[in-house]
């Protein structure tokens, strides 16, 4: 969630948006995609709302901009309009093959904080790991982005002179697909959710009592916590096809990630009838604030959810620990080779455990001081304690920012009172 894309214009016509989805969608996959019945012109319907943003479009000065804080806002709609100089957002999609040997991650960005890494405020990162441990990475700085929100779903298109990337998500957030048409990367990905969208407190979307703020000024909603995913792309002229575990996240911040976060961990597992997700965030602003949450589903239904990370005799809790002694660790100073996720419900007298083993590095970034971020594809085994244990794919990601950095600086600013008409 997602570091894969974290570091690595002109208004376009409706016809250009519609034409951008020509990515050799496999014929047998059409049954997976419920939006085909809307017809080819659906995305130009008057029922849709269109957000267009080019690479250099930004609100100047300290004027108020829209920043989503309502937990009932459409998860896929833009969260910040227009951009200002401090905040940003991303749509992130990732996946791991069934054998844990391959992974992908797409990041669609509207974020001026990464203009230092390229041209403008738009960014697109596509990363893939291969079975031979090599990785394919493509980072683009598109000239335009368009997000179309309709009653049946959301489409985003990030375009440059000779490439385009598209994501589409159904309104019920159960199915998503990604397409890419670039000189060295073409193809598509489809994922079908096996767990409902969740907030930072683990509750299910929609929930008017929930909050999307996980730590101060940093907001997150796990739109597709876990999904069955299929990948069919061609990179550098070579086919790349597999199925496994996927997920999709929405993240938006009032300030840069470095300003808001000290560290973060994210895990997803799918084994047999079970799907488990764990996320934790450490605030860089409110020192000592640690916000974990864990959710477990069985046969697509949530059966366990908690934010408690210490053992209790009465309350549901989850304990997440690092393990060592395996074959695959990152190149940073942290050398964990896997993880253990244990969930306990004292009232139900039930316990579940999943052991995760890293199989390959999906992506990695060194940020200085021996820290940074690493995403692992892997395998997991687990289930209900004392009952049948299941095997399946896993995804694990850790991020830690250095305490001091010449590249990343805090961009926090105090808000101007709203009665003055400015932020």
Curated annotation (Swiss-Prot):
UniProt keyword annotations, A-Z: Glycoprotein, Isomerase, Signal
Highest taxon, organism lineage: Eukaryota
Pathway(s) annotated for this protein in UniProt: Secondary metabolite biosynthesis
Signal peptide: 1-18
Glycan-linked positions: 84, 132
Family: Belongs to the Diels-Alderase family.
Function: Diels-Alderase; part of the gene cluster that mediates the biosynthesis of chaetoglobosin A which has a unique inhibitory activity against actin polymerization in mammalian cells. Chaetoglobosin A and its intermediates are involved in the morphological differentiation of C.globosum. The first step of the pathway is the synthesis of prochaetoglobosin I via condensation of one acetyl-CoA, 8 malonyl-CoA, and a L-tryptophan molecule by the PKS-NRPS hybrid synthetase cheA, followed by reduction of backbone double bond to install desired geometry by the enoyl reductase cheB.
UniProt protein name: Diels-Alderase cheD
